[in-house]
Amino acid sequence: MTTVTQMKCACPHCLCIVSLNDAIMVDGKPYCSEVCANGTCKENSGCGHAGCGCGSA
């Protein structure tokens, strides 16, 4: 059996892959940052991770 250790950030605008050990969990969903977890990544210029672009228009 395979154990999942990483998943895509649950934010629909984000492209980040987040380790489940380091993720910010909200309602059982993994997020890469506080701004993605609280749904404000667009308003806050993205999550700040290189290459993501979730803060882009």
UniProtKB/Swiss-Prot annotation:
Superkingdom, taxonomy of origin: Bacteria
UniProt key word Zinc: yes
Biological role: This protein complexes cadmium, zinc and copper.
GO molecular function: metal ion binding
Protein name: Metallothionein
Keywords: Cadmium, Copper, Metal-binding, Metal-thiolate cluster, Zinc
Family note: Belongs to the metallothionein superfamily. Type 14 family.
InterPro entries given in the database record: Metalthion_dom_sf (IPR017854), Metalthion_fam14_prok (IPR000518)
Keyword Cell membrane on entry: no
Native species: Thermostichus vulcanus (Synechococcus vulcanus)
One Pfam family in the UniProt entry: Metallothio_Pro
